[in-house]
Amino acid sequence: MAVTKITDLNLKNKRVLIRADLNVPIKDGQITSYARINASLPTIITVLKQGAASVMVTSHLGRPTEGQYDENLSLYRVVNYLQQKISIPVRLIKDYLNGISFTEKQLLVLENVRFNKGETKNDETLAKQYAALCDIFIMDAFGTAHRAHASTYGIAKYAPLVCAGLLLYNELEVLSKALNQPVRPMVAIVGGSKVSTKLMLLNKLSKISDHLIVGGGIANTFLAAQGYNVGQSLLEPNLINKAKQLLKYKNILLPTDVRVSQELDNAATLKHIREVGNNEKIFDIGDESANRFAKILQQAKTILWNGPVGAFELTHFRQGTKILANAIVSSNAFSIAGGGDTLAAIDYFNLNDKISYLSTGGGAFLSFIEGKTLPAVAMLIERNKNN
């Protein structure tokens, strides 16, 4: 891969700035998942061990009004957690755009980049201010690599030296291999609510997968394209013709039985797809379909999963996603999962350590699989030519 990685550079006595993805979920003032921080730790610890003169890490958190400080979205909670994981002092720096005074043996966390006006617009002046803070910029935030922001793309343009962190490099390696050199059979699962949000993903995976399992609300449009009544289920009528075109790929697999109800909080009824009533809504795939898909998954050598196949948050619409998840982890396949809802389902079923690779990207994960250019990665590649 044409990206300089962290191990290619000598960091000793250098000022190093790491752009991590520390955008953790917060509820009632508490971090509810430390997964993104933990995923960033190997890069941070590697830099600390390399003898850098100063080590800085920054990230965005949430969506504050740009240019305004919001204590609820401050990185101070992240600092508190990092201090538990790192033996040297960890300091939060709020005012850093005009330079930083620092002492050795400290990790400096630069406050939420979205508090800086111009961050999401990739303001050139702001990008140059970031770049002036460091000798080496390490891009390690795969989750934001699809955004051309000042702290991901702009700084990479102006920093003296740039490279990919361990997390970003690993994400690119794993996903590239799965897409370009998969061990076959390759099975993909695409769930979620709307076809419109995953049209490019479906199009790409239908071409490279041996089997493409479609579930969730997305499946409703495909079922309607086959002539089935989906009642009051979530449906995108304007995409039925597109679904018909995709169904020409004979590797797309749809449920033949489903769990329905008139509302999410009502009891579920298991029905063949031909039996869905006019007032019913589909909220999960049925057991027959789930078990049929499970057998295919257990024969796979590569599995790519994005999106639950039902409303797994509710007990009566959980079974389909649970059966597929268990089939994935009991297979001998190299399994990759990405997307917030997918990772939430995996976490709910306590299968985090049984999936081969959990991608930290949501939008970036989808964009990469779809074949889109990730601006921050493209800039790293461009700079690599000149490093």
From Swiss-Prot:
Its main location: cytoplasm. Its EC number is 2.7.2.3. GO terms for cellular component: cytosol. Keywords: ATP-binding, Cytoplasm, Glycolysis, Kinase, Nucleotide-binding, Transferase. Substrate binds at residues 21-23, 36, 60-63, 114, 147. It comes from the Bacteria. GO terms for molecular function: ADP binding; ATP binding; phosphoglycerate kinase activity. Belongs to the phosphoglycerate kinase family. Monomer. This is Phosphoglycerate kinase. The gene is pgk.
